[in-house]
A protein has these predicted regions:
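Hydrophobic strand positions within the blades of repeat-based beta-sheet folds
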Residues: 19, 153, 162-165, 178, ...
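Right-handed parallel beta-helix
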Residues: 98-99, 111-112, 133-144, 159-171, ...
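Right-handed parallel beta-helix/beta-solenoid
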Residues: 1-6, 34-66, 70
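Bulky hydrophobic/aromatic "packing anchor" residues in well-ordered structure
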Residues: 1, 11, 17-19, 45, ...
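N-terminal extracellular ligand-recognition/capping segment immediately after the signal peptide
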Residues: 7, 73-96, 100-105
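C-terminal accessory segments
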Residues: 1-35, 122, 129
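Glycine-rich beta-solenoid repeat tracts in large extracellular/virion proteins
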Residues: 3, 87-90, 123-130, 151-157, ...
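Right-handed parallel beta-helix/beta-spiral solenoid domain characteristic of secreted/periplasmic
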Residues: 94-146
């Protein structure tokens, strides 16, 4: 189930209950609605953590890049609600970078977990190069960017996937919300507004 402890009995996309049993049989749950079960370990990141920690829920890393560096294909990196300024590279890994909104069933965490420009301004989130093609970013917001090109998200020569993201309140002469160059990025259930 998506999150049984809080009463979310929708099935995950790769649940063994899908297409099983006899048609017409009620099993007491809803259709698929929340994505696949994460197959790899889950790494946590919190700005109050430390990169010498093990990346667990109680002992998170301080930086996203540290979590990426220790991850392998299929892993998930979960960000605690906070503002993130970090430049990252996914190093050709097929990983998911997400907020804890799905884990805890609190959709507001998408707004509370966001990338913003650093103290000197600029874009909120930049990915450059094909080493970022296999990444999935979901349940995160990008806001407050002020720059010439790509206030919110800048994707250059890479094509990652964005799911359930909010890109808002960014300013740029070109691509206020999103600036793509050499990219075939995929955006699903994305809100792009007030840019």
């Amino acid at each position: 189930f998506c999150n049984a402890p809080i009463g979310n009995y929708y099935l995950r996309e790769n649940s063994p209950c899908i297409d099983s049993g006899s048609d017409g049989t009620l099993i007491g749950c809803f259709e698929s609605a929340c994505g696949p079960v994460n197959l790899g370990p889950i790494w946590y990141v919190d700005q109050n953590g430390h990169d010498d920690n093990d990346g667990g829920l109680e002992t998170p890393f301080a930086t996203i890049q540290r979590a990426i560096n220790v991850s392998t294909d299929g892993d998930t990196i979960r960000l605690t609600p906070n503002i993130y300024f970090e430049e990252i590279d996914f190093n050709n890994k097929e990983v998911v970078l997400e907020s804890r909104a799905y884990e805890l069933g609190i959709i507001e965490m998408i707004q509370e977990t966001f990338f913003a420009p650093g103290p000197l301004g600029g874009s909120c989130f930049i990915l450059n190069g094909p080493s970022n093609d296999n990444a999935t970013i979901r349940g995160i917001s990008f806001r407050g960017g002020v720059v010439t090109s790509g206030g919110g998200v800048v994707l250059q020569n890479c094509s990652p996937t964005f799911i359930d993201v909010v890109i808002e309140d960014n300013t740029a002469e070109i691509g206020g919300g999103v600036f793509l160059s050499g990219s075939n990025a995929y955006f699903l259930n994305t809100i792009i507004q007030n840019n």
